[in-house]
Swiss-Prot record:
Transmembrane segments: none
HAMAP family linked: Ribosomal_uL18_A
One Pfam family linked to the record: Ribosomal_L5e
Single Gene Ontology BP annotation: translation
Protein name: Large ribosomal subunit protein uL18
Organism: Methanocella arvoryzae (strain DSM 22066 / NBRC 105507 / MRE50)
């Protein structure tokens, strides 16, 4: 390991691979609320944050687990459909909190068009939240509705059947849950 007066130790969160401080500084300097989208091994998490000197403050939050509890979503909490619905939900919650515009904070995720992060972003944009982005990065509407899953009858979708949903019925179920979210939040 390098030693001596010229050696500089990186910040702890950078060493742990959790924070890109160069990117974070650019996001903070914009003085806009951040739409933070993170995905775990089982769900998608979206938050609207503002930066304060004492730390980040959460204005609104939504998870794909909330979709199952509140709106009866039976699909996987980590697929593209769940990411879109989570983005739609966070967009409506942000508007209830008085946030009209935000910027996307992807964290250390690789920037890949059509990913679940961009599906959540499309949901937020469709709810009316203004986020600067290009339409080219969004996944296709067929993929967001889950038609790629409905067309595949592989045995890897048995979890849907355990939840009482056939993989072929996912697009219709997606539209049903989207309608519930829109009727609860969008009609105001």
């Amino acid at each position: 390991m390098a030693t001596g007066p010229r050696y500089k130790v990186a910040f702890r969160r950078r060493r742990e691979g959790k924070t890109d401080y160069h990117q974070r500084l650019k996001l903070i300097v914009s003085r806009k609320p951040r739409l933070v989208v993170r995905r775990t091994s089982s769900q998608v998490i979206a938050q609207i944050l503002v930066t304060r000197p004492e730390g980040d403050k959460v204005l609104a939050a939504a998870t794909s687990a909330e979709l199952a509890k509140t709106f009866g979503y039976k699909g996987s909490g980590k697929n593209t459909s769940a990411a879109y619905l989570t983005g739609l939900l966070i967009g409506y919650k942000a508007q209830e909190a008085g946030v009209e515009e935000a910027i996307l904070d992807m964290g250390l995720r690789e920037n890949r068009a059509g990913s679940r992060v961009y599906a959540a972003l499309k949901g937020a944009v469709d709810s009316g939240l203004e986020v600067p982005c290009s339409e080219d990065v969004f996944p296709s509407d067929d993929r967001i509705r889950g038609e790629h899953i409905a067309g595949n009858t592989a045995s890897k979708y048995t979890q849907y059947e355990k939840n009482g949903l056939k993989a072929a019925d996912l697009p219709a179920h997606f539209d049903e849950v989207k309608g519930k979210i829109t009727s609860q939040y969008g009609a105001k």
